[in-house]
């Protein structure tokens, strides 16, 4: 990955102008590539749209275009050419030779960002696995970057052709080892998650296109210092915090990695565990930047990924963010009329209270509310309810303490069974 102590590499960004795609659409793709490249730490020196009737098997772009690019790269002292397309290993290798510069395709660039953003041990291993699987057929790449603390695709290249056979063997061995380690991590996570599944906190996951404002909204709701900046993929590993709701009650809220259009399928599979909180959530908040002219396309992109994760049937509330940037509220009013939608500004706080109220109603529909009466002297069971239920209200009496709690049906049954077996003086009364 790019080293922070070095000056950023100067890059030229290349987008193919294909016959069936409008120039405006291609320009939007190029604009997105600018954001991706900046996030990866590159200095964007130039961007260029190149007409392409059909991809050339050897170099992707035509020979005349490649020659012109080579001259420009030499004159402008450009270090990296970023191609907004998935290149074959042969195309990438040939382009690097002809351009005399490092060539990175879309998949490699996204991997570079993931590598820089991974926080947990599991996230780092997932990045490394995805990078290695990407590199397997790119024989000029070296495995030496794997010795770094975080994996990446290595924008600065490797030691050369004589390493190819060694690379093949080392990469195969490392992939096998990583898969075994990740299987063990997944088993451990399943065991660690089991106690939390018994805690009746309603789980909500923030999802959305990159830069939709998820982390900013997460910070506002939780007052947590999660990395929130104007860069794509600002959160790679899910971060969870408890959020207090109006009228009592709590939820577990998770902030997750943003999705993008044309995310390579192999990356979705490699990062599936990173999105585990999405797959296990009781509810999704789909955060949409309504001020972006391309917001409808982004919604389609996110919905496509959710379908791949098989969570499209999870109850979803669409949160239209950045409404403070709208020139007219007409579009917001139209979308709010569809239902299961709400408008907010994570920047100004507008709409956050109604959002919390909506979450409160969702919790109320999913959880059971009970009045629990127990002796004041029974500190163990008092602590147990605080640990294993969402305590909405506490009323202290002379001899008894009364709790209003919310909990899942399975947890209620388990606690009632424990009370009966132990013969303790605890009463349960449903609250309408």
Swiss-Prot record:
Top-rank taxon of the source lineage equals Bacteria
Q: Which family is it part of?
A: Belongs to the TRAFAC class OBG-HflX-like GTPase superfamily. HflX GTPase family.
Q: Under what name is this protein listed?
A: GTPase HflX
The alphabetical list of record keywords is: Cytoplasm, GTP-binding, Magnesium, Metal-binding, Nucleotide-binding
The family database entries (Gene3D superfamilies) matched by this protein are listed as:
6.10.250.2860, GTPase HflX, N-terminal domain, P-loop containing nucleotide triphosphate hydrolases
Q: Which CDD domains match?
A: HflX
A Gene Ontology molecular function term for this protein is: metal ion binding
| PANTHER family per the UniProt record, alphabetical | GTP-BINDING PROTEIN 6-RELATED (PTHR10229:SF0), GTP-BINDING PROTEIN HFLX (PTHR10229)
- Coiled coil regions, renumbered to chain: none
Q: InterPro entries per the record?
A: G_HFLX_dom, GTP-bd, GTP-bd_M, GTPase_HflX, GTPase_HflX_N, GTPase_HflX_N_sf, P-loop_NTPase
Instruction: Give one Pfam hit by family name.
Output: GTP-bdg_M
**Role description:** GTPase that associates with the 50S ribosomal subunit and may have a role during protein synthesis or ribosome biogenesis.
Does rRNA processing show up as a keyword for this record?
Answer: no
* Compartments it resides in: Cytoplasm
NCBIfam families on file: GTP_HflX (TIGR03156)
Hflx-type G domain mapped to chain residues: 202-367
Record's GO cellular component terms: cytoplasm
Residues bound to Mg(2+): 215, 235
Per the entry, which co-factors are needed?
Mg(2+)
How this chain assembles, per its entry, is:
Monomer. Associates with the 50S ribosomal subunit.
- Binding-site residues, GTP: 208-215, 233-237, 255-258, 321-324, 345-347
